[in-house]
UniProtKB/Swiss-Prot annotation:
Name of the gene: carA
Domain of life: Bacteria
Function: Small subunit of the glutamine-dependent carbamoyl phosphate synthetase (CPSase). CPSase catalyzes the formation of carbamoyl phosphate from the ammonia moiety of glutamine, carbonate, and phosphate donated by ATP, constituting the first step of 2 biosynthetic pathways, one leading to arginine and/or urea and the other to pyrimidine nucleotides. The small subunit (glutamine amidotransferase) binds and cleaves glutamine to supply the large subunit with the substrate ammonia.
Protein name from the UniProt record: Carbamoyl phosphate synthase small chain
InterPro entries tied to this protein: Anth_synth/Amidotransfase (IPR050472), CarbamoylP_synth_ssu (IPR006274), CarbamoylP_synth_ssu_N (IPR002474), CarbP_synth_ssu_N_sf (IPR036480), Class_I_gatase-like (IPR029062), CPSase_GATase1 (IPR035686), GATASE (IPR017926)
Family affiliation: Belongs to the CarA family.
GO terms of molecular function: ATP binding; carbamoyl-phosphate synthase (glutamine-hydrolyzing) activity; glutaminase activity
Phylogenetic lineage: Bacteria, Pseudomonadati, Pseudomonadota, Gammaproteobacteria, Enterobacterales
């Protein structure tokens, strides 16, 4: 169905709630778990984050698309969301870095999206009832029951191993640092000096994580999620990095086994997001599904040791259960929103992890010092003798 402004679309939730709006992306139907993200900026980074695989993302900021899109802001090689929900799409793109409009970008990448939705009402529903499945479809009366059934039948994130689906299929090297406006190369690329070799386990890694490691003197070998730990160790790394990623960490037994092998070695380990959860599982902790997760760039987190408060970028639907923790796990960070565990370290190993995203992209860089702590551990091992 269309009107003077284009094709009409409808979002149907699994509880039967309907939101009527307009199609702003590719034509068609999509279904996924509906979550909300509270970031004000960074919509292109959000939708290209592999951690959003299997999900339809609601952007709570009311005005989206005003700076267009460009290839430098992509956090991976493709868009990973199953759909997008916004309040209002900007009719123009105004930024000197813009290469194409956001709507064109969505259409070219075959992403179904809907605008003119009361995103505040939708967010309140998700906050009260928890994340639930939804279906975006052309707005026809006969489609309502179809969309409802699709939403009801869609698989929950619980029990889904999505990391192996979004991971790289081959081993590759990465030596590109951060992009600086008006500079063709990062300072480190000009120096051409790398102090450490890091094996990065790709469970859905974001490019800015790789760039921030390179900025600190690391040469990276990125490996698939299911890489045998013997292969990784044969690469003679100075450290192991466990990346972010989508889905439930509990089915990722291959990753848990690999991490347990690494923990037997005197090698520094740093995990982020899904990597944080996998390190916890490998160390004997438990994981639970959250009601609506943490998705946004304004989440306050307390550093336990110093009582310092940092504002962080977050994107996860599962969390480490802080109850019944093994004695060798120390909690280093906690959320000031809901008290959930945000960081941990192993007291008898050179291993630590953080639930949020210290690389931001989008979001604040308050937690970027965690990368510096990783470098400190690498120095401690490599140059102690």
């Amino acid at each position: 169905m269309e009107d003077a402004l284009g094709q009409l679309a409808v979002l149907v939730l699994e509880d039967g709630t309907r939101f009527h709006g307009r199609s702003i992306g590719a034509k068609g139907t999509t279904v996924g778990e509906v979550v909300f993200n509270t970031s004000i900026t960074g919509y292109q980074e959000i939708i290209t984050d592999p951690s959003y695989s299997h999900q339809i993302v609601t952007l709570t900021h009311p005005h989206i698309g005003n700076i267009g899109t460009n290839c430098n802001d992509e956090e991976s090689s493709k868009i990973h969301i199953r759909g997008l929900i916004i309040r209002d799409m900007s009719p123009i793109s105004s930024n000197y870095r813009s290469e194409k409009s956001f709507s064109s970008y969505l259409k070219e990448n075959n992403i179904v999206a809907i605008s003119d939705i009361d995103t505040r009402k939708l967010t309140r529903i998700l906050r009260t009832k928890g994340s639930q499945n939804g279906c975006i479809i052309e707005d026809k009366k006969e489609n309502y029951s179809v969309a409802y059934q699709k939403a009801k039948k869609f698989l929950s994130l619980q029990g889904l191993d999505l990391a192996k689906k979004v991971s790289t299929k081959f081993i590759y090297n990465w030596d590109k640092g951060s992009f600086f406006i008006n500079k063709s190369k990062s300072k480190l690329e000009k120096k051409k000096k790398f102090l450490f070799h890091i094996v990065v386990y790709d469970f859905g890694v974001k490019r800015n994580i790789l760039r921030m490691l390179v900025d600190r003197g690391c040469y990276l070998t990125v490996v698939p999620a299911k890489t045998d730990p013997k292969i990784a160790l044969n690469l003679n790394p100075d450290g192991i990095f466990l990346s972010n990623g989508p889905g439930d960490p509990r089915p990722c037994d291959y990753a848990i086994h690999a991490i347990q092998c690494f923990l037997k070695k005197n090698i520094p380990i740093f995990g982020i997001c899904l990597g944080h959860q996998l390190l916890a599982l490998a160390s004997g902790a438990n994981i639970i599904k959250m009601k609506f997760g943490h998705h946004g760039g304004n989440h306050p987190v307390k550093e336990i040791k110093t009582n310092r408060v940092i504002i962080t970028s977050q994107n996860h639907s599962f969390t480490v259960d802080a109850k019944n923790m093994p004695n060798n796990i120390a909690i280093t960070h906690s959320s000031l929103f809901d008290g959930t565990l945000q960081g941990l370290c192993l007291t008898d190993k050179l291993a630590f992890s953080f639930q949020g995203h210290p690389e931001a992209s989008p979001g604040p860089h308050d937690a970027s010092s965690l990368f510096d702590h990783f470098i400190k551990l690498l120095n401690q091992v490599k140059f102690s003798n």
